Each structure stands twice: as structure tokens, then as C-alpha cells.
């Protein structure tokens, strides 16, 4: 039994209800992502696996691409060295996943899928990926989401089988690639007391009308642009499928015409054997594009809902 088969069999025992992240880790992720912008540099998550929860207590960024090339040091060696340093100072060094910054939550791609699969297949089925969106966070709402691959998708990815028949057999749609895990931000009692004081001081502010600002046209435009790009890419994938089907049909037509000219009957078994096997395009790209389009529509829906709420409040204030 190889490691992939063992991972799939044990997946049902890896129930994960919540991911608890220290507030300091959230601040470190935001700070590290801001320092490396516009480059999107991912990083490692460290913590503990406790029952049906995952506790994230520390993190560190991976080396940027240019530094990695200059030092000729692989990311794996860098991770091992960092975790060795953390163990020396008695800090949790257990890998529980990784984080990655993204623009407009556009992280549904094959690179992320492959990285997350390797984490779950080789380290722990409960390993997660935390996605941070600096653009959406700049709009006033912390955008931090946690995902891991589903069991059904892990099975398909292990076999690299994403044909139409295999997807139908597994009953897998674009919604079945990732499962989202709830995030709980945890702070110490001292930090909670400090935040309580800050919250009390902010309540003394007399003017909070700036929160009703709805001039986020740039954000909405970027989301629509991203959706348009995904739709164009999806159309290209559909064209590949159409060309593949047309080539198969051309082979069948040529065979039937040849038999007709020879005055012979068409043998279905012979026809099936005469058709040259064509490699159909993988449906993985189409699944990821569809998932990303669905993600963009959710963002537009959320943006529209918040804007309508603000408009309603402004209307009441004008009365």
C-alpha cells in the first residue's frame, strides 16, 4: 500500500471542524504579505493538531523567488532550517499547512492544487491553506479564508483522471474541489483587555459617516475584469473539447465513407478499433475556472449587498 492509498483510506478519520489562529499570526501574515508586495510570497503555518481542530500558533514566509535563485537553496531546505531554529527556542514547529496571499481571491489554479495535495498526502490530512486577500482587506473587512481538498477530489487527483466519464462517476462538480473550514481568531486575555480599551475609545468618536462610503468602483471593476478573463479562458477550454470531438467524428465519417465505397457493411466493433485514441483535454482546468467564476460572483453579491445596506442607511439619514 503506497502513501496515497493510505491517505485516502484515513481521510474519513481526519474530521476538521475549526482552525484556530492566534491574533499575532494574523498580524504576521498581513505584515509579511505587505512587505513583499507586489510579489505574492506564500509561507508556512506551524501549530498543533488537536482533535477536530487545528491550532495555528506561528508562521514564517518562504524566500522570494529572486533570493531563492541567488542562494541556490530550495524551499524544502529553507523550511527545515527554519523549523530547526524554532525548535531550538521551544516554539511549535509542527507543520499544519501554508498560507498564500492573492488578489481578489483568485487562487483556484493548478499550482495551489498541487501544493495543497502534497501537504495533505505527505504531512497530514488536516493540513490547510489560508488565503489572504490584501485588496479586499483594504476595503475595511479582513479577508482570511481557510481551505483543504475534499476526499473525492484527492482520489481523482491521485490518479490524474479528470475525464468527463470519471467526473460523472465520482459525482464531482466545481463545488467539490475545496471544503472551507471556519476560522476562529484567538487572543490572550491581555490582548483582549487592550482591544476592549481601544473599542471603548473608538465609541467616543462623533463622526462615523465615512463608513457609509460606497465609492469602491475600482474594486468592483477588478472583480468584473477577473471574471471576464476566466470566462474567456473557459471558452478556450470548451473549444478544445469541441475540436477533440470533431476529430473523432471525422475519423468515423472517413471510415464509414470508405466502407460505403467498397460496398461493405459498417462493423461497429471494427469501427471502434479503427478510431485512433485521442487524448481528451483534462476537465481539471474547466473545473478550476468554473470555481473561480463562482467565487467572483459571490464577491459581487457580497459587494452589492453591503452597498445596498449603506444606501438604505444614507436614505434614512437624509429624512
Swiss-Prot record:
GO terms for biological process: formation of cytoplasmic translation initiation complex; translational initiation. InterPro entries: eIF3h, eIF3h_C, JAMM/MPN+_dom, JAMM_MPN+_peptidase_M67A, MPN. It is found in: Cytoplasm. The keyword Mitochondrion does not apply. Disulfide bonds: none annotated. Its main location: cytoplasm. GO terms for cellular component: eukaryotic 43S preinitiation complex; eukaryotic 48S preinitiation complex; eukaryotic translation initiation factor 3 complex. Keywords: Cytoplasm, Initiation factor, Protein biosynthesis. Pfam families: eIF3h_C (PF19445), JAB (PF01398). GO terms for molecular function: metallopeptidase activity; translation initiation factor activity. Residues 19-153 form the MPN domain. Component of the eukaryotic translation initiation factor 3 (eIF-3) complex, which is involved in protein synthesis of a specialized repertoire of mRNAs and, together with other initiation factors, stimulates binding of mRNA and methionyl-tRNAi to the 40S ribosome. The eIF-3 complex specifically targets and initiates translation of a subset of mRNAs involved in cell proliferation. Belongs to the eIF-3 subunit H family. Component of the eukaryotic translation initiation factor 3 (eIF-3) complex. HAMAP family: eIF3h. This is Eukaryotic translation initiation factor 3 subunit H. It comes from Dictyostelium discoideum. The gene is eif3H.
